Amino acid sequence: MHDIRAIRETPAAFDAALALRGLSAASADILAIDEARRAAITQAETAQADRNAASKEVGKAKASGDEAEFERLRALVSTKKDEIARLDEEAKAKDAELTAILEALPNLPSPDVPAGADEDDNVEQHRRGTPRAFDFKPLEHFDIPGIAASMDFETAAKLSGARFVTLKGAVARVHRALAQFMLDTHTEENGLTEINAPVLVRDETMYGTGQLPKFAEDSYQTTNGWWLIPTSEVTLTSLDSGNIVDEATLPHRYAAHSLCFRSEAGSAGRDTAGMLRQHQFEKVEMVSVTHPDQSNAEQQRMLACAEGILDKLEIPYRTVLLCAGDMGFGATRTYDIEAWLPGQDTYREISSVSTCGAFQARRMNARFKPSDGGKPEFVHTLNGSGLAVGRCLIAVLENGQNADGSVTLPAALHPWLGGKTRITAEGNLA
C-alpha cells in the first residue's frame, strides 16, 4: 500500500515511478478522490461543531420561553444530524474508492533499480562457479537414466493432473535432504529462527503481503474460504501483522520449509516438461522484518545466505538485479539468483530476494516503537527463497550427472544422506 502523504507531496515522482512499472499516471485521480474525502471529513466536522453549538442553545431557548427560537434550534440540530450522516457516508465511500486504487498499484522501484520492461533488461551482477565441461551431451533431469524411474509424472497426472510429480526412492530422499540441509544452514549458521506455520490462511493474511486482491486467480482457495499459500513469505511476514514491536528487537529473521501452491494461471505452455514449474512444490523461505535504516544491508545479507547454499552445493549460478518492469508486485528491489542447468544449457531462477520497504507493513499495519520514544513507524519487510527445493534438486541432478546415467551428489549433502555420495544408474543411493 502506498503512503497518500507521499503522493500529495511528490505526485510527479509517484507518476514517474509508475511509468517505470509500465503504468499510466495515477496521482491526479488519486489526489482528486483524496481531496473529496478530506473535504467531506472537514465539512462533517464543521457540521458537528454547529450541531453541538445549537444543542447548547436549545435548553436556553426553552427556559426563556422563546418558542420560535426553540423550534428553530431544534430543527437545526436535526438538520445537522442528517448532514453529518450524509457527509460521513460520503467520506467512507471516497475512502473505499481511494483504497481500491492504492491497493491495486504495485510498489515503486527503488531509485537504483534499472529501467526496463522484462527479463531482457535485467542487469547481471556477478557469476560464481564455472559450468562443468561435459564429455557427453548432458540431459535434462527427467531424462537421466538413474533418475527417470524415480520421478514419476504419469502417476502424478493420474492422481492430480498436469504439473505434478511423484518422487520415489533415492530422488525423494535427496529432495528431503536438500530441504533439511537448507533449513539447518539458515538456522544454525545464518541465525534465522525456524518457523512451522499453517499453509492455509485467511483473506487478511494474503492481503497483507499483496497476493490479494490482484492475484487471486494465481492462488488456490478452499471451499470454506481459506487460501493455500503460494509461498511461506505470506505466513512469515504476517507474524508481525498488527504488532508494534520494540526497535531493540529488530531485525526479526525467520525461515520456514513449506509446501507452496500456485495455479500458474499466466504460464500456460511454459516449462511443461519436468518439474521446473509445478502447482505444488516445496521451498525454504527467508523473511526479515527490519528497521527502515537497515533494510538495504539486510537484503545483501539475505542474498549472501541464499547464494551460500549454492556455493556449498557447488552449483554454478549468476545473480541479476531485476529491472523495474520485471519485479514482483510488492518489491521495491529484487535480485534473482539463477542456477546453471546444463540440460537446458542456460541459467534458470532458483531464488528471488526482495525488499518491499514499508509497502507490506502498511497493508498489515506492522510497526515498531522507536527507542527514543518517538511515534510508532512502519517496519520494512524482506523475503527471499533459500532455496526452491525442487529447482535445487534439478540443479543438483543435472550438474552431477555422469555418462553412465548415474549422478554424483555434492559433498555438502552427504551428511544428510547417511554418507551416501551418488545415485546409481539403476536409481539407488550408494
UniProtKB/Swiss-Prot annotation:
It is an enzyme of class 6 (ligase). ATP binds at R262, S263, E264, E349, I350, S351, S352. L-serine binds at T231, S232, E233, E285, S385. It catalyses: tRNA(Ser) + L-serine + ATP = L-seryl-tRNA(Ser) + AMP + diphosphate + H(+); tRNA(Sec) + L-serine + ATP = L-seryl-tRNA(Sec) + AMP + diphosphate + H(+). One of its GO terms (molecular function) is serine-tRNA ligase activity. Coiled coil: none annotated. The keyword Membrane does not apply. It is found in: Cytoplasm. It comes from the Bacteria. One of its GO terms (cellular component) is cytoplasm. InterPro entries: aa-tRNA-synt_IIb, aa-tRNA-synth_II, aa-tRNA-synth_II/BPL/LPL, Ser-tRNA-ligase_type_1, Ser-tRNA-synth_1_N, SerRS_1_N_sf, SerRS_core, tRNA-bd_arm. The keyword Aminoacyl-tRNA synthetase applies. GO terms for biological process: selenocysteine biosynthetic process; seryl-tRNA aminoacylation. HAMAP family: Ser_tRNA_synth_type1. Homodimer. The tRNA molecule binds across the dimer. Consists of two distinct domains, a catalytic core and a N-terminal extension that is involved in tRNA binding. Belongs to the class-II aminoacyl-tRNA synthetase family. Type-1 seryl-tRNA synthetase subfamily. Catalyzes the attachment of serine to tRNA(Ser). Is also able to aminoacylate tRNA(Sec) with serine, to form the misacylated tRNA L-seryl-tRNA(Sec), which will be further converted into selenocysteinyl-tRNA(Sec). This is Serine--tRNA ligase. It comes from Jannaschia sp. (strain CCS1). The gene is serS.
